[in-house]
């Protein structure tokens, strides 16, 4: 069996069906003796260019080990499913199980956002109320 990285884009109006689609595709691979090494749902994202006047899509990425027969059936499912607006299948030399760069970047972005939104401790705890009353207005004294 060979290793593949599969990315497919689902029409944004069909985003609620993504879970069922992923379940159906993973079942198809596993029933043929294949294995899912990584599954990432990247969610709804902006497209680089419009596809059929659609500017956003729901992205899903799979790293699988499967037979050529299962892959052909999966590609047929993509081709005849109107909700899948694009798909890409890349043959890999080995199984990839770590997080993708896309998911790592998203987590880093959310961590930075949390740190930014976290309230800083106030300076009033040291007795300074911020009115600068102890600073002289006259600089040449």
Curated annotation (Swiss-Prot):
Keyword Acetylation attached: no
Superkingdom assignment: Bacteria
Example of a GO cellular component annotation carried by this entry: cytosolic small ribosomal subunit
Keyword annotations: Ribonucleoprotein, Ribosomal protein, RNA-binding, rRNA-binding
Bias (Basic and acidic residues) ranges: 103-124
Region (Disordered): 97-141
Any Pfam family matching the protein: Ribosomal_S6
Acidic residues compositional bias, start-end: 125-141
GO molecular function: small ribosomal subunit rRNA binding; structural constituent of ribosome
Gene Ontology BP annotations: translation
Stated role: Binds together with bS18 to 16S ribosomal RNA.
Family in the record: Belongs to the bacterial ribosomal protein bS6 family.
Protein name: Small ribosomal subunit protein bS6
Naturally occurring in which organism (per UniProt): Pseudomonas syringae pv. tomato (strain ATCC BAA-871 / DC3000)
Gene of this entry: rpsF
């Amino acid at each position: 069996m060979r290793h593949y990285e599969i990315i497919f884009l689902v029409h944004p109006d069909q985003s609620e069906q993504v879970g069922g689609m992923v379940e159906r595709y993973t079942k198809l691979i596993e029933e043929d003796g294949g294995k899912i090494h990584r599954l990432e749902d990247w969610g709804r994202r902006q497209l680089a260019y419009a596809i059929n006047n659609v500017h956003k899509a729901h992205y899903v990425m799979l790293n699988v080990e499967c037979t050529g027969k299962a892959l052909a059936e999966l590609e047929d499912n993509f081709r005849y499913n109107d909700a899948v607006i694009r798909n890409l299948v890349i043959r890999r030399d080995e199984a990839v199980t770590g997080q993708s760069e896309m998911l790592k970047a998203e987590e880093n972005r959310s961590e930075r956002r949390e740190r930014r939104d976290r309230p800083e401790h106030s300076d009033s705890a040291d007795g300074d109320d911020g009115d600068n009353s102890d600073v002289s207005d006259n600089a040449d004294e």
